[in-house]
Amino acid sequence: MAKVISFFISLFLISFPLYANDYFRADSRTPDEVRRSGGLIPRGQDEAYERGTPININLYDHARGTATGNTRYNDGYVSTTTTLRQAHFLGQNMLGGYNEYYIYVVAAAPNLFDVNGVLGRYSPYPSENEYAALGGIPLSQIIGWYRVSFGAIEGGMHRNRDYRRDLFRGLSAAPNEDGYRIAGFPDGFPAWEEVPWREFAPNSCLPNNKASSDTTCASLTNKLSQHDLADFKKYIKRKFTLMTLLSINNDGFFSNNGGKDEL
């Protein structure tokens, strides 16, 4: 009997792989749409072209959304959660009116911030277990997707042929310490006087701030977030270049001749 139980447990694990270090997002966009866009881009990136408004990459604003609970038109993050089950639950709540939607599986990387970890007791929706992707999720970070039809997940995961495991292998979400300074609480918000945020608070965010009115906490937070996003993109670009060179070498593009490499 024990062997039979062990067999079915093994079969279950093989049939439904666990993604302990990956993240999940329910989205109405089809894989073809995502591919054409180069990934899961934030709403603010689209709206920036139409409205001519800057993208807001303030984590607290993102987590709160609008008064109706919808995504802000200038939002610079893309939401994910920690389990397939949670993503399905959120998808049914937000996308239940669609006959079909998708749950994307996303590789861990430092562009993902733990909303509950960074915002602490000020996180507005802690039950969602959100990890917010700063600047969106590039196509190369998407491992694959599940199709949801009339509320039910159909079959297994479809793998994304453009996923770059070599770029994201071994990476993890950003540590909370990297997120405290871009938490984005409003000017003079109580959290800026509390641990841990007061240790990381930009001067413009402190309650006793006397900076000029054109240097607000929100504007400074956006600048810091833009800097972090630029650093992440540079890191991925450098790693991509390195992996490309290594693959060329491994494929025999370079031939060894008397201890010398030549084209």
From Swiss-Prot:
The active site is at E130. Gene3D superfamilies: Heat-Labile Enterotoxin, subunit A. Residues 1-20 form the signal peptide. GO terms for molecular function: molecular adaptor activity; toxin activity. Disulfide bonds join C205-C217. NAD(+) binds at A26, D27, S28, R29, T30, P31, D32, E33, V34, R35, R36, S37, G38, G39. Keywords: Disulfide bond, Enterotoxin, Signal, Toxin, Virulence. GO terms for cellular component: extracellular space; host cell membrane. It holds the Pfam family Enterotoxin_a. InterPro entries: Enterotoxin_A. Heterohexamer of one A chain and of five B chains. The biological activity of the toxin is produced by the A chain, which activates intracellular adenyl cyclase. Belongs to the enterotoxin A family. This is Heat-labile enterotoxin IIB, A chain. It comes from Escherichia coli.
